[in-house]
Amino acid sequence: MGNGLIYISLEVIVACLISALAMYYVMKKIYYARGQAVLKSASAKAKLMEFQAKSFVEAEEMRMKSQECKLQQQYENKNLQLKAHFDKKEAYLKHLEAQHKEFVRDEKRYLEKEKQELEKERQILEQEKENFKKQYATCKENQSKALDVMLNYMAYTKEEIKSMILKQLEEELEAQKSALIRRYEKEAKEESKKKSYAILAEATARFAGNYAIENFTNRIALPCSEYIGRVIGKDGKNIEAFKKISGVDIEFSEGDKELCLSSFNIFRREVASETLKILIEDGRIQPNRIEEVYHRVVRNMEKELLSEGQSVVLELELGAMEDELKILLGKMRYRSSFGQNALQHSKEVALLAGLIAEQLGGDKKLARRAGILHDIGKALTQELGRDHVSLGVEVCKRNKEDPVVINAIYAHHGHEEIMSIECASVCAADALSAGRPGARRKSDEEYAKRMQALEEIALGFEGVEKAYAMESGRELRVIVKSNQVRDNQVPIIARKIAKKIEESAQYVGEVGVQVVRESRFKTTATLKQ
């Protein structure tokens, strides 16, 4: 019984051990398989990450190479630009050097010619001196002989005869002296006249400047005739808004492919032309857009005035100059006198004055400076309404310009005597530039003055902000300040302006006065979620 139980227990234990071993083996197989699967998955992920890393590195390398190529291209382009700029500057300097050498050669020839002429004059004077000595010796000898003869045959003392002879000689010498003075005065006048003609001829021959008559119109090309309708706008709103803000007339014919802008004020016309070009190129033409573009163009053109003046100063090699004067030089580009552009005229005067002063032994640089500034007051006449001479003197004194410049401003209109060679050169150059046939047109200047006078009449009334003379003086458009003028005052101002025009106008016709009062209010709405 006991042995049987032991046997059964052993069988159970063996069976349990076998089951446990079998279970262990099975579990080992299962975990091994799972481990292999995890290892394979991890290996695949590692390979994927490695592939992604390689792809990222390759992409970055390609991007860096592309960036490097781009930078290399930019560097090469910049290098080419700098090289082209350097070559241009080098060519310009060589050109200047050649001009300078030619000028030096001309000066040497001129000085050599002058030296030869002086040598001839010296020889002539030496010969005349010798002749005079001989004549004097002969005269003394004849005087002594005559005195001896007279003493022998006349009842006069030696002193009396000597006195008579001296008196006669004195009268003869006085007559000869007068004749010589008249002869030398005539020769000096003829010589100075020839010399002045030669100087002016050489100065004008060495000067070659651009020249163009200023007109009162600008023409704007259109892509097609349909753009005329877009410029006019619905019910004419666009063209009215453009005229109101610019003060410039627009003329066109149906079917035309261009617009004509007309105004006596060059700056106003240039701003309007640039504004219209931008609007046509952009395609969006509406009142708000017109006003926005117009104000932007005005700001940009006012910024360019200083750089324009700086270019003139560098071109003429004038040295340092105050910014206020440079800005006024830039403004002169948009001023005209008798149809002649004020800046172009002043540049001509500066160059000619420099050449003339150089021939006369004056300061070429100072003469150029006085020439470019002699009409500087014309840049302020439209705003301040005074004569350009007093305005030019005032602004030049404020900027501490040389007294020669002040004298040139006064003297070129006869307000002062000419005090220097440089001033005389400026006056002569001004007469040459203005007096050239076709350089000036009197009718254009009279028309511009008539238009400006109409605007000045309106601007003289209190509350008037802007005034534009339009339609060749047949219409005066006046814009008043809304914060100073009430609606019921607008008709009164219009009648007063019309009456003032009637009293002061010196020509026949009618002028329509249109007074505009406009109020604008602007605020900002804040949107919250």
Curated annotation (Swiss-Prot):
Q: Topology relative to the membrane, per the entry? A: Single-pass membrane protein
The Gene Ontology biological process terms listed for this entry are: mRNA catabolic process
Which SMART domains does the UniProt entry name for this protein? HDc (SM00471), KH (SM00322)
EC class of the enzyme, as a word? hydrolase
> Boundaries of each HD domain copy?
342-435
Q: Where are the transmembrane segments?
A: 4-24
Q: What is its main location?
A: membrane
Record EC number: 3.1.-.-
User: Is the keyword Transmembrane assigned to this protein?
Assistant: yes
Q: Which GO terms describe its molecular function?
A: RNA binding; RNA endonuclease activity
CC annotations in GO: plasma membrane
User: What role is this protein assigned?
Assistant: Endoribonuclease that initiates mRNA decay.
State the similarity comment: Belongs to the RNase Y family.
Which named protein is this?
Ribonuclease Y
Organism whose genome encodes this protein:
Helicobacter acinonychis (strain Sheeba)
